[in-house]
Amino acid sequence: AFICKNSWGQDFGDEGFFYISYYDTNIGMNSVVYTKLGNSDNYDKIYQSDLMGEVGTMGFDDRPEAYFANVYTAGKNETLKAVSFYATGPKTTYDVYVVTDFTDVSDLQQRTKVASGEMQYEGYYTINLNEAVPLADDRKFAVVVHVNTQDSTMPIAIEYNNDEKTANFDITDGEGYISLYGTKWSSAEQENDCNVCLKAFTDVGD
């Protein structure tokens, strides 16, 4: 048997250790592999509303592409350095945009492209911006992402309450939007009962 150590603590098994049979038929299902990890102090602040991470995915009309956005309120003297989100399938192309002065959903049309590229494999990625973006003090800003995922018709990773394990998590703590073409937007929280998995990273004082 394999001897495993639970990374979530010592409550399960024998103080966190447990056995898995070589003949177990489920051990290879839903596997996650970390190939590269950044330092936890890469950036000064993180903006996020998806504390559970990806619980599921969604899309539009069996299309491989979609837009999604999250809105946050900047602190003092911050610059936006990077964003992170999921590729729900291999060979996902992406464009990242920023709206530095967000007042309502119509401002998402005034987005400025700050990064683009392709993610070869399905997974979770941190994308550094081409240049740091200064943010206005105490003002809302929006991060917008367009993805095209060739092998998936559910290109948006979302957080939502899907079973008893996630029933008590708050999905009303964000302001997210989704769109097929980036023109007509719907609220992730109010109309789709979910949060968008899209984080923003800033440095203070740069």
PLM region spans:
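Active-site signature of cysteine proteases
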Residues: 1-77, 97, 155-205
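Residues within well-ordered beta-strands of beta-sheet-rich folds
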Residues: 5, 69-71, 81-86, 97, ...
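Intrinsically disordered, low-complexity segments enriched in polar/charged residues with Gly/Pro
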Residues: 57-59, 83, 120
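Extended extracellular/luminal ectodomain segments enriched in beta-structured repeat modules
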Residues: 74-82, 91, 138
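Aromatic- and Gly/Pro-enriched, solvent-exposed loop/edge beta-strand patches characteristic
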Residues: 90-171
